[in-house]
Structure formats: C-alpha cells, structure tokens
From Swiss-Prot:
Residues 1-35 have a biased composition (Basic and acidic residues). It comes from Dictyostelium discoideum. The lineage of its organism: Eukaryota, Amoebozoa, Evosea, Eumycetozoa, Dictyostelia. InterPro entries: UPF0746_actin_org. Residues 1-39 are annotated as: Disordered. Belongs to the UPF0746 family. This is UPF0746 protein DDB_G0280811.
Amino acid sequence: MVNNKRKEIDNINEHHEKDYNHDNGNQQEKKKEEQPQQQQKKQCILSFKDVEPVEIYFWKVFRNIFIFKHIFSNFKSKQYGYYDLIGCDEIFFLNGRTNSMEIIIDNIKSNNNHQIIRNESNIIDIIHTFKKNDEKTRSFYNLLFSRYSSGSTSPIQLSSTIRFDENIDKWIQRMIKNVNCTALDQFIKFFKIDSEAIKKVMEIHIKPSFFGYTTYGKLKIYNYLKSINSLPTSHKLLPFINTDLEIFLSFDNKFKKFIKSYKRLIESTNLQEQQEQQEKQGKLKIHPNNKKYYEKLNQKILELNEIQTSQFTNDQLNSTIKNLLNHTTPTSTSITTTTTTTTTNLTIISTESNYNNNNNHNHNNINSNNKINLKDIIKKYYESIYLFFYFTVKPENKGVFRKGLFYYLKFKKESVDKMYERVVNKWNGSSFDHKLFFQSILKDINIEKNEKFELILNVLDNKYVKTFREYDHYIFFKAVFSSNDIELIDYFLKKIKQLQLNQIPEITKYPSIGKLICDYCHLIDKKEILDFYFQNYRDECLLFNDQNENCKYIQLELIEHYEYLTGSIGNRCKLDFIYWYKNLNFLDRLNRAIMKPLVYSIDFGGSSSDFKWLIDSNINNNKENSIINFLSNAQFKQPLDLEILGSSFSPYAAKLLTLIKFLFNNISKESIETKLKVINLKTDNKNFEEKYSKIEFTTTLTTATNLLSPKKSEDVGCLTIGKTESFNFTISITTLLVCLYKLDRVDDIIYLFDKLPEVFLKSYYSSIFTKEYCIYSISSSYYLELFINYFIANLNDTTNYLYHCLCIASEKGYTQIFKNIISSDQNSKYLLKIQTESNQSSLFDSKLLNDIVDKSISSLNFELSNLLIDFIDFSANGQNTLKMKILKLK
C-alpha cells in the first residue's frame, strides 16, 4: 500500500514536471530567462516530495465537497461546545480525551466566561495527569499558573476560586504528593519560591516517611528537591527506604527505565557519608567482608558511570530486559545505520571506538577489548542494586531483599533443584512463588529437557513436600500444560497414568488424564497440541466428543482447526448460553456458531438478564458491530429487553450510539406514536405494572455477511446471506426518549409531546425523561434551550419540566441561556420574577428561584450567580444571603 501511495505521489510530481517544462521548444535565450523561475518551481517540487502520502489523500477527501459533507454529517457540531464541558475530571475528561490539554489551553486563552476548570479538585486531577517533562507541558503549566493567580490580567472574572499564589504551601504539598516534577519545577520558577520556603513546607506538610516506600516517581522528585537544595535535614531517603523490589527490579521493565531507576537510586544518597554516620552511631561493625562488599559496590558504580546511555540503541533502550536477555530484540551500534539481529551475544560498541572507526572508514579493525557485552552490563546493574540495598537497609529488613528467579536463570548457571532451594524453599514460597518458578523453568529454552523431566518427576513424587501444598499441584499442572511442549506434556501424562495404576482408585491423588486435558485445554496455543491429543488421547477425554462444550475454551486462533478435528469423526459442538456471557470472547464464538449450524448446536434459552449482560460487557469492549451481527442472526424465543440503551451514566454510554442507530433505523415517529397510544389506553385503570410496562418494537434487520470463504460456508451450511429478518425488543418510555435524543431526533420528541401530552404530562409519568436526574447527564446547552423554549410556549402542564430544565442550566453553568431569557422580547423574562399575590403572571415562588441561584453558586459559576441575583426581585435580605454564600467560596 505504501508503495502504491508513493507511486501516486511520483506520478503527481511527474505531471508537475511536464507542466513546468511545456515550453521546451522555445528558443535557448527564452529558456535562460525562464531558468530562475524553473529552478524555483523545481524547489517546490522537492518540498512536495517530503509530504506524507496519507496527507495527500487527506486533502483529496477534504476538498471533495460530497465526501466532506457526508463525513461531517455524523458530527453534532451545533449541539456540543465549550458550554457542555463542565469540569475536567481525571477519568472522563483528562484521560478520556486525547486532546484534553489542548482543550484546556484553548479555553483559558479564549477568555471565555464558561471556564472548564471549576474547582481545586479539577486542578489536582490535572497535576496527577500531566507529568511529562517536555516544552508543551511546561508551557501549559505556565499558562495555568498565570491564569489562576491574583496577578492575572484576564478581563474575564474567573468562575473558579483558585488562586495559586494565595496558598503556595498547599500547592507545593500537592505537587510533591502527586510526584509531579514538571509542575513543581514550573511552579517554583513562576512564583520565584526560594529553597528555604520549600524546606519549610516539607517540614510541616510532608512527613519523612513519605519517601519510605520508594517508587520511581518518588526517587525522581526526591533527587529534584535535593538538586535545588530544598530537602530539610529530617528528610532522608535512607534508611527509611522500603522499595518493592519485585516491581523495581522486574525484568519486564524497559531497559531505559531500569537505567533511570538505578541512577535515581544511586544519586539519592552518598554511600560513604552514610557509612561514616552509621560507624559514628555504632550501627555498623567494620568487618572485612563488609569492607570487601562495599569496595565491590563502589567499583561497579564507577564502571557503570563510564557507560553512557547514548551508547545503547533505541531498540535496546525501548526493549524489556527480559527480551534483551532472550535475544528477541534487534540490536545495532549507536552510530552505524545498519541493524543486525543477534542470537548468541549482545554487544554495544563504545562511542570512542565508533568515532575512530568512522574516521578510518574501516569497520573491520574494531578492537575486541572495546566491545561491551550487554548481558554483563545488565548483570552489573542488578548486582549494584542488590549490594546497594545490602548496605542501606536496616538489618531487620534485609531478609525481604531476595534475588528473583530470572536473575538466576540468566546470570547464574545452577541446577533446577538449587534454584528451587534459593528462590522458593528458602523463603517458604507462596503459591505465587511456585507458579512463577514452574512456568519459568518449563518454558526456558536454555534448560535441558532432562532437567525438566526430573522436575516433573520430583513434584509428582512429593520431593518438594516441605513447601508444596496439595492445592499447589494445580499450579504445577497449569505450568506443564502452558508450556505447550508436546514432549513435556506427554511425559507428564504418562507419569500420571502410571501413578494412578499403582494407587487404589478410591484414593487416587491426581485427576484423570481426560479431566486434566479438558481442564487445561484453554492453554493450547498451537495446532500440533490439538493433533497430539486427537491422535493419542481422543478416547480418554471429552475434548472431541459429540455435543461437547469445550469449544468455549479453545483459543479463537485455533477454533477452526478444532472444528475440523471434531467434525472429521462426525461430531458437533454445543454452545449453551447460560453462564458464559461474561467470557470476553463468548460473543465472537456465538456469532461464529450461528453462522455454522451444521457444526454447532445452540440453546438460546437464556434469561433476559443473560442477554443484557452479554450486550453490556461487549459494548464496554468496543464490540458494537459484533453485537449487531448477533442481533441480526440470533433466533430469540422472546423479545429482548434492551433497557441498557438508556444508560446515561455509564462510562461507555457514547458507544451505545452505533447500536441505537441500528435498532431505530426504520422505526418512525408515527409508529412510536401508535405504540404510545396503546400504552396510554392501559393507564386508565391505574394499574402500576401496566402504566410502567415496556413498549415492544419490531425492527427489520438483514442477516450479516458471512465472514467465511464461499467454499467453507457451503461445507458447514451457513445461513442465507441478505435475508431479511424481524427482531423484537422492549424498552421503557424513558429509554425510548433517551434513544431519540441520542439520535438527534429531538424534533420527534417534541412531535410526541404535541400529539400525546396525556402520556408525558400526567403525574405518574413525571419521572420520564425530563426529570433532572435523567436529562442532566445527556443534555447539551443547545438542546436544553430548545426544551426550555418548547415548555415556555406550552405552559399548560409543563411548569415542572420547565423548572427542572432551568435548574439544570444553572447547575451546568449555561449562562447564555439565562441571558437569552432576560433579553427576550417574547416576555419570557417573567420566568425569573417571584410569584406574589400581586404578580400571578410569574410561575415560581422565592424559594424555587433561590434554589436555581444556589445551584449556580455550588457549581462556582459566579458570573451567572450575580446575573440572577441582580435580575430576580429578591428582597434585600435575600440578596445579601446569596452574596455571602459567594464570598465564602471565594
């Protein structure tokens, strides 16, 4: 595809070349006169070649009016804007939007009355989220501090009460506790805070124990504070350190992070100074071995200090340590452009050697002494850290710092038994320790097969009985089967069978072979294992039996081969719906089974709650299209309850839109009206169940296109492609209206209000849709104002609805809606006047209007609060009370 795009760009360039040179037949003198202009044009062509191919296609689409309109017709641009962004919480806004920082920057710079940042909690979430140390983040914090400080020159009155410089201590404390070096550094520079002030904050607000449980972030901020001389003497990283070595020294860490962690740790303390202090306090006895280890550590630190990060390639730095040691990452020198993959020895070449080699243009004369073995470097890092902890932790805590199994696997050549003794038995190993040990040993390609056989035999013979408990056998079984090594599995099964033959059946210790194979079939990751079971253990297990349910466990990548093996002996798979809807892959399996009725038998007898959770869980996993495919082809025994469609509060409510469009594609407002009329007739007898009964809809669907090849489809007897099917579902009136709202069918909602006011405006339907708890979560300022205008124009029975909408507008801070009401020439401003005996044209009493203002104060939108206080005819005492509330929050 890339080549095709490049060809197209070259063709475009060639076309331009021909256009520029179309006067080649002119006289030579004319050519010379045009030569500067030709050169200028050719220079433009060269810059054009630097454009990414995808950008060419973007502009082709962007300039095509028809395609452009079609794409942007899916965006509700007039409905959503800054006025609909309320607060910047960490989950839904900061991490839920890829451009959240840009939105905040734009909102601040726009001097808009509607500020997204509403309170200190929003700022704390920002500090917790944006920590990257780059120019963009630094500029962002400078802008933030400038905007929210007492010296701000913004012409707009801030709706928020935040003033960074009015409580310097509190914000320093928050930035340290959120380990945000970037924000703290910019904060100190912006407000020109001296080191003594920071020390004072540390002494009062940050306990020395804060650095006791050390993470990478805490090491980073500790060293930063130390570098600017802002650490009080009471705050020492050591001996309070209690680092989680399992995380800190994990071989799954990226190499570059591991190097940084090492440097942060070593830089955080002066070993010699600490040793001298401990000697003075009599805490450290000078023993020859201690001195030897201390000298060894210093020597390793010196050696590692000579190694520069620039000597490693980007591939190496971005790889995990485990991958580097397993030789699965391409490695290359830091200067040469060629990359070579190694399988025996990982090396880097010193920059000095590279420099000399490049100057001499001779890559064959590299001094072998200048080559550094990467494995040795990694080993030095680990040994240095282990020695470091030996000298810095309290004696009573030294027992928790043990070397991990992977350290012995990669850096020490020891027997399996000896490694078990070191990393498991010595520490009275937990189930997790056993799990890690067995899986690592059995999957390690560098350990001889005979040693693995011996391990299996020792476990089955209870050689590890000291720490190996009965239920730990299942951990071992899983480790064997997850190895996906046919030789190991075969050896294990034969030994199990042999042990069972020598035992009394009633007290057999281990499960049957057939049960073991089925219990762990979800671990099979290659066809050869399936073939092995099929050829050798087919009669001893249920894996390939007729109507077996093991298809639920087989990995999707292998399911086709499993179907082939099962079908080759005339058997079918069975897929029961009950209890399996929570499996992440169940919907994919279900769709596959529906399309292959000759291979699967399916029972759709699950309850409505089963189907609800199936849809719920898969919407959360971005599988809207799979759900649609399922609904298009499934044969339900009863209408499906889809009340989940009305979910407005779930974090994935927006993902439901695709499904809602699919279901309501051919359901007109007239058909909805007919259904509601039937519901309305049922309400006359005031029966609760009937009044709140669900509405049943029928939508027309087309069976999904089969994903299998035509030949395979013919073999398994797939459903007819393109066949029209009917699908019945039920929803409540509330959910119906929420769905119409989400589909931008607000006109249809108003149509239904007009046609069936008795349905929506009766007291027992007062909780439907327009209640504050429901409309609050989904309404934009644009549509909320539409509803307000509609209720104003139809005041017969809509006063309650109108009031709820005004409360929502106030709480969300939609200032413009109230400005429009106040400036309206349609005499709607009376809505914001107090109803009295002499003024019956108003709708709301003093308490109701007071509550509207209270909501704006609670949301910290003081501009709106002051607007309403000044306009509503409160008493002088009432105005003063509301203004005092504002002052208390400022």
